[in-house]
Amino acid sequence: GKYAHLTFETANFRNYTPEGRDITNTYDSIVRNEWVLHGYYKYNCKPRNRMYLHVMYHAYMYATWYHTAYVVSTAEAILDPAKMRNPKSQGAAWGPSHEIGHMNQIRPGALWHGMTECTVNIPSEYITTYVFKQPSRLQEERMGDGNNRYSLAFSHIIAGETPFCSAGSTNSKDGVMQGVDVFKQLVPFWQLEL
């Protein structure tokens, strides 16, 4: 594509993406819209290279500074444009948007100590909610007590008067927060977007 380069098993492309252009357009849309969100176009600093996504066989999903990787068992979801763009669910787009988001994280602007996994979810929420018109994960996901993530964040951060950077932490060990809920941390950032 124009913004993304995908390398997966040929059989997976044939099985899940009969029209290759559809999945290419889907990933181009993710990458381009993340670049817009991060201000790459506004400040004329758009990367010259495509985002590289490829299959691997030893982990789930991860990102480095130069590629993202997806375990072969995810191919059915992430190579199917209908599943990626499904407006009635949170779809399969969250994972790739999250990993591509790691490659786009602005340093030091949105990459603070202890907040990496929170701030990378800003583009994931943006892509799934605004670009693919899927329900917000913060509003739709029900937690163990039946509340959504917004309700939990409100009761913990606002009512509980807890700094959002430590939202959900259960204790501190050697100065490192344990059990931080990155989705509770995400709520105040997402409020800025709304």
Which residue stretches match the model-derived regions?
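Catalytic cores of extracellular degradative/oxidative enzymes
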Residues: 2-193
